[in-house]
C-alpha cells in the first residue's frame, strides 16, 4: 500500500494508528512484495498472517493458491480486511494472536507464518509459533532490530542470550535485512529488521531431554555476570570434570557456551537412568498365543508377531488427547498418534502394559480403562496384535521428553477431518484406531 492508500483507508475506517497496539503500517510496496517472497510459498500452503493491519502484505499473499488466515486484534480493521479479501480460502479472525488456538491450524496444509509483530509482544509470539504444538515450518517476521539481532547472535556477544540458544535449538535463524523507520507510517522510534526462522530437520537436532534443556539455559543466563558454576549448584562438586568435557575454563559464563556446549551440559546434568538390559518381547502365533521371548531388535528385524497397546484418553468434554511422537523415534517420527502406546514386555499382559505406558509416556496413573477393540497383525500395525483401551483423564500430563514432542486435546470431528485430508500427519496405526473413536 502507498502512503495515499493508507491515508484513504484509515479515513474510510474512521480510525487512526493506535500506539498501544503497536500499529506502524508498511507503505513500501516493493518491500512488501519482497517480504512475501521470503516465505517461499508453495501451492496448497496455509499462510497465517499476524497483525495484517490494512493489508500491505496481504495484497501480495492473496493471489497465491493458498489458504490464508488473517489474525487481527483491532476490530476497526477487521471489517476492512473481510471486505477487501473476501474469499472462500481467506479466514479473518478478530483476536489477539497470543490467543490463537494452534490446534486449529493442523490439517489445513503446510503452515508458514508472516507478520509485522508489535514490538511489545514479539517475544511471546515467537515462543508460541515456534513451540512444539505449532505446525509452522517457516516464519518470516518483522521485528525490532534489537530482538532480530538477539535471535541471530553469536556466543560471546552482548546480544547472545537464553532466547538465542532456546530458539536456535529447533530453528535456523537468518537475519534477512534491516528496515529503516521511514518505511512505516507512523514511523516507529526504532529501526526494524526482517528475520526468517526455518524449522530444522530431525537429523540436525540433537536428541536431548528438553524438559531439562530450557530451564538450564534460562538459569544460566539469569545472572550473566556470574560464573556458570555458581548457577548450577548440582554440578559444582564436579565442575572441573564438567568444564573439561565442555573444553572451557572453569570460570566460563553462560554467554561463552555455544548451542552444542549447552546441549552437552544438559546431558551431563541429566540424572543417570538405571541401566536396563535389552527389551524382551513375547513372540506370538496367529492366535496371539505366546511362543517364546526374543530381543526387541530381533522381533522387529524379522517381522515376528508380537503385542502392543494403544490408549485413547478423552477429557470430560469428550475431546481426544493426541501425542506428537518424538522426532527421534525410529518409527513414524514426528507424527501424531494415540494418547499413549507401547509394546508389551515379555510376561506382561495387555492391561498391565496399558497402565505402565500411561505412567512412562504421560506421567499419569491409569484411569479406569475400558478395552474397546483389537487390531490383528499386518504391515500397517508393524506385525503387532494391538489391544485398544479407552479412558477419561483431564490431566495435567508430564510427557516423556525423549518420547513425546507434545500432547494436546483435539475435537474428535476435527481429528477425523484432519486425518482424512492429511493422513501423512498420523501414524499408520492411529489411522486404524480411528474406527474406535
Regions from the language model: what does each represent?
Residues 193, 197-199, 204-241, 249-260:
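An accessory alpha-helical subdomain
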Residues 276-310, 316:
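Acidic, metal-coordinating catalytic segment for phosphate/diphosphate chemistry
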Residues 91-93, 174, 370-372, 408-410:
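General small-molecule cofactor/ligand-binding pocket signal
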Residues 330-364:
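Helix-adjacent hinge/juxtasegments
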Residues 295-297, 334, 373-437:
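Nudix hydrolase/Nudix homology domain
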Residues 51, 303, 317, 355, ...:
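Active-site segment of metal-dependent pyrophosphate-handling enzymes
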Residues 1-215, 244, 264-267, 271-273:
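Catalytic cores of RNA-modifying enzymes
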Residues 308-340:
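A glycine-rich, hydrophobic loop/mini-helix early in the fold
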Amino acid at each position: 500500500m502507498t502512503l495515499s492508500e493508507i491515508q484513504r483507508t484509515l479515513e474510510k475506517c474512521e480510525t487512526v494508528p493506535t500506539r498501544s497496539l503497536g500499529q506502524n503500517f508498511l507503505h513500501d510496496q516493493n518491500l512488501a512484495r519482497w517480504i512475501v517472497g521470503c516465505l517461499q510459498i508453495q501451492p496448497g500452503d496455509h499462510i497465517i498472517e499476524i497483525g495484517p493491519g490494512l493489508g500491505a502484505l496481504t495484497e501480495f499473499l492473496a493471489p497465491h493458491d493458498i489458504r490464508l488466515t488473517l489474525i487481527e486484534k483491532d476490530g476497526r480493521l477487521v471489517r476492512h480486511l473481510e471486505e477487501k479479501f473476501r474469499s472462500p480460502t481467506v479466514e479473518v479472525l478478530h483476536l489477539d494472536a497470543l490467543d490463537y488456538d494452534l490446534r486449529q491450524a493442523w490439517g489445513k496444509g503446510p503452515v508458514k507464518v508472516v507478520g509485522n509483530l508489535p514490538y511489545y509482544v514479539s517475544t511471546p509470539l515467537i515462543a508460541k509459533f515456534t513451540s512444539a504444538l505449532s505446525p509452522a515450518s517457516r516464519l518470516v517476521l518483522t521485528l525490532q532490530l534489537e530482538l532480530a539481532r538477539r535471535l541471530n547472535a553469536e556466543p560471546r556477544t552482548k546480544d547472545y542470550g537464553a532466547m538465542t540458544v532456546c530458539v536456535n535449538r529447533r530453528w535456523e535463524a537468518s537475519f534477512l535485512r534491516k528496515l529503516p523507520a521511514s518505511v512505516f507510517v507512523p514511523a516507529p522510534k526504532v529501526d526494524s529488521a526482517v528475520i526468517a526462522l526455518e524449522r530444522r530437520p530431525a537429523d540436525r537436532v540433537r536428541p536431548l531431554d528438553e524438559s531439562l534443556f530450557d530451564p538450564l539455559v534460562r538459569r544460566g543466563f539469569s545472572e550473566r555476570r556470574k560464573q556458570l558454576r555458581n548457577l548450577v549448584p548440582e554440578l559444582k562438586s564436579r565442575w572441573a570434570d564438567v568444564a573439561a568435557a565442555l573444553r572451557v575454563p572453569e570460570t566460563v559464563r553462560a554467554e561463552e557456551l555455544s548451542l552444542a556446549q549447552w546441549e552437552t551440559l544438559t546431558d551431563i546434568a541429566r540424572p543417570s537412568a538405571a541401566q536396563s538390559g535389552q527389551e524382551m518381547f513375547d513372540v506370538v502365533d496367529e492366535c496371539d498365543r505366546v511362543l517364546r521371548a526374543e530381543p526387541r531388535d530381533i522381533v522387529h528385524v524379522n517381522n515376528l508377531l508380537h503385542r502392543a497397546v494403544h490408549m485413547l484418553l478423552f477429557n470430560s468434554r469428550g475431546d481426544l488427547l493426541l501425542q506428537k511422537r518424538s522426532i527421534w523415534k525410529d518409527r513414524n517420527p514426528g507424527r501424531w498418534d494415540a494418547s499413549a502406546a507401547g509394546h508389551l514386555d515379555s510376561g506382561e499382559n495387555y492391561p498391565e502394559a496399558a497402565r505402565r505406558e500411561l505412567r512412562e509416556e504421560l506421567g499419569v496413573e491409569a484411569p479406569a480403562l475400558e478395552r474397546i477393540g483389537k487390531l490383528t497383525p499386518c504391515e500397517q500395525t508393524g506385525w503387532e496384535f494391538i489391544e485398544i483401551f479407552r479412558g477419561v483423564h483431564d490431566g495435567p500430563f508430564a510427557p516423556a521428553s525423549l518420547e513425546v514432542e507434545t500432547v494436546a486435546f483435539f475435537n474428535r470431528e476435527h481429528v477425523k477431518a484432519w486425518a482424512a485430508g492429511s493422513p501423512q500427519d498420523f501414524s499408520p496405526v492411529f489411522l486404524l484406531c480411528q474406527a474406535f473413536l
